[in-house]
Amino acid sequence: MNDDFIAAEELLQRGAAALSFPVNQEVIEKLMHYLQLLAKWNRVHNLTAIREPQQQVIVHLLDSLVVAPFLPPAQTIADIGSGAGLPGIVLAIVCPQQQFFLVESNTKKSVFLREAVRQLALENVKVVAMRAEQWRPEAKLNVLISRAVSDINSFLMWTAALGDENSRWLLMKAHDDEVCTQKDFYVENVLPLTVPLLDAARVLFVVKKKS
């Protein structure tokens, strides 16, 4: 591991210590393995715009980790528009008892996701290489999460068939001023998120289907 990644691991350990739940060294090492895989693939494929390891720790890893306390235990969770596996792979590493689906239609990104899942030995993760609106899982999902949502209402429309009134849609946003206009949904809560080492606002929209 070069100096950049050594410094990044130290930063991750510092940031993880500020989270509201414990993160052990085994998890830290697996997260750094993921970051090294991402760096390797980024040299050939443009998976993420942020390439500096310490910045990736803050904007990718810690920004994903802060939502872990809001995931219900022993549930099926789909990361919609997973991209390079954010937040899905990060959450799957810290929540090994939960089943994750990484839904990503972009071919180069879904290929990377499969390779990352293989190399990280994430037995609780499956990659779904298709658009969310085309996917029909065997059962309704308990949680649908995304940090790639530009418009909440379009996202809810595309993913409505994947959950029911017992499901939760967790949408990570920079601002809390969006309004849900989808008639079959309502916003149950808007939770402020504090990302360690990041001087920027983050909120989590918790959305449910009406009964």
Swiss-Prot record:
Molecular functions (GO terms): rRNA (guanine-N7-)-methyltransferase activity
Keyword S-adenosyl-L-methionine: yes
EC number: 2.1.1.170
Gene Ontology, cellular component aspect: cytosol
Catalysed reaction, written as an equation: guanosine(527) in 16S rRNA + S-adenosyl-L-methionine = N(7)-methylguanosine(527) in 16S rRNA + S-adenosyl-L-homocysteine
Enzyme class per UniProt: transferase
Localization in the cell: Cytoplasm
NCBIfam families: rsmG_gidB
Task of the protein: Specifically methylates the N7 position of guanine in position 527 of 16S rRNA.
Entry's family note: Belongs to the methyltransferase superfamily. RNA methyltransferase RsmG family.
Stated name of the protein: Ribosomal RNA small subunit methyltransferase G
Originating gene: rsmG
